[in-house]
């Protein structure tokens, strides 16, 4: 197994798919990385040489924010919104949907399990 950005990527998959196992790299970025390193995307990870794996690793480290750094950056951005006291920050603080979804019904994922209310039975 090749280890890139602290993640063991699967060896039997194509490079473009295997790179997507890294948090912060999706289909488009995986394609960009393959272009930069000039590796055909349909090539398998098993067939990569150590030099090619090293090139991929260096490209990701140099050009992309991935894994822990990305998670940390997102958490800091959310914390900044909460400290500002803006609408989005308040929604995060109250653990409600942030992007304008309705909450009268639905939003159970964000709000958690429904809390029973006494005397509400019919």
UniProtKB/Swiss-Prot annotation:
Keywords: Ribonucleoprotein, Ribosomal protein, RNA-binding, rRNA-binding, tRNA-binding. GO terms for biological process: translation. GO terms for cellular component: cytosol; small ribosomal subunit. It comes from the Bacteria. InterPro entries: Rbsml_uS13_C, Ribosomal_uS13, Ribosomal_uS13-like_H2TH, Ribosomal_uS13_bac-type. Residues 95-122 are annotated as: Disordered. Pfam families: Ribosomal_S13. One of its GO terms (molecular function) is tRNA binding. HAMAP family: Ribosomal_uS13. Part of the 30S ribosomal subunit. Forms a loose heterodimer with protein S19. Forms two bridges to the 50S subunit in the 70S ribosome. NCBIfam families: uS13_bact (TIGR03631). Located at the top of the head of the 30S subunit, it contacts several helices of the 16S rRNA. In the 70S ribosome it contacts the 23S rRNA (bridge B1a) and protein L5 of the 50S subunit (bridge B1b), connecting the 2 subunits; these bridges are implicated in subunit movement. Contacts the tRNAs in the A and P-sites. This is Small ribosomal subunit protein uS13. The gene is rpsM.
